[in-house]
């Protein structure tokens, strides 16, 4: 099976501070891949390097067969990315933000956006400044999904979402994956990975410590947090 993502010996540092160190992993096309670890483990740095938002020190990254540096703009057209923090102009309406995200890609996503907003119970008539954290997350999810990309990358997508919306969110992921998409889910919530992901990678202190199927032993995983705090 083809790989949607191939990372080889990725290293990224921030001066004297740790980023990621010699990370290598592959994500198969059609996978729901869990990227899990404590906060500060290097998950977001890896994702931003994948998308070309960070210039990494050494290594190579291929996304959908394209080079993450040379083909940066092409990759962004094929990827739906949701960052861990959703920032929008407070004065804009939800509907305006969603339409703007589609217009940037030169696409008409009205029908898909409407379906997503209904599934996520998102009121598009409100202004961003009126929204709770959870509803801002919903806007970010719609912006990442509405163009039906080949690869979804979600960074801590469910924080602030109530249980019903979390369930609906994962139903949407399963729907798109059944149509041929691939999903990377970066999270620190082990239960999400065990319930929804097919495969997973665990990061700690900038290093990939484990690659395994997504049935991860809870005691083993909690030890990473305990060791991190010592």
Q: What do the predicted segments below correspond to?
A:
Residues 163-165:
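Helix N-cap at the start of a conserved alpha-helix in ABC-type nucleotide-binding domains
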């Amino acid at each position: 099976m083809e790989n949607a993502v191939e990372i080889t010996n990725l290293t990224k540092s921030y001066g004297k501070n740790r980023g990621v160190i010699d990370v290598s992993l592959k994500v198969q096309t059609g996978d729901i891949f869990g990227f899990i670890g404590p906060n500060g483990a290097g998950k977001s740095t890896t994702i931003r390097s994948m998308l070309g938002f960070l210039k990494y020190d050494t290594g190579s990254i291929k996304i959908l067969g394209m080079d993450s540096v040379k083909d940066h703009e092409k990759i962004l057209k094929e990827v739906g990315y949701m960052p861990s923090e959703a920032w929008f102009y407070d004065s804009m309406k939800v509907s305006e933000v969603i339409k703007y995200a589609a217009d940037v890609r030169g696409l008409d996503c009205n029908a898909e956006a409407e379906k997503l907003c209904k599934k996520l119970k998102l009121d598009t008539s409100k202004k961003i400044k009126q929204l709770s954290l959870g509803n801002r997350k919903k806007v970010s999810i719609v912006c990442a999904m509405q163009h039906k990309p080949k690869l979804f990358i979600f960074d801590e997508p469910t924080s602030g979402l109530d249980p019903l919306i979390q369930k609906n969110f994962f139903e949407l992921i399963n729907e798109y994956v059944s149509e041929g998409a691939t999903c990377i889910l970066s999270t620190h919530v082990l239960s999400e990975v065990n319930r929804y992901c097919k495969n997973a990678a665990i990061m700690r202190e900038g290093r990939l410590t484990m690659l395994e199927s997504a049935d991860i032993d809870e005691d083993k995983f909690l030890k990473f947090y305990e060791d991190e705090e010592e």
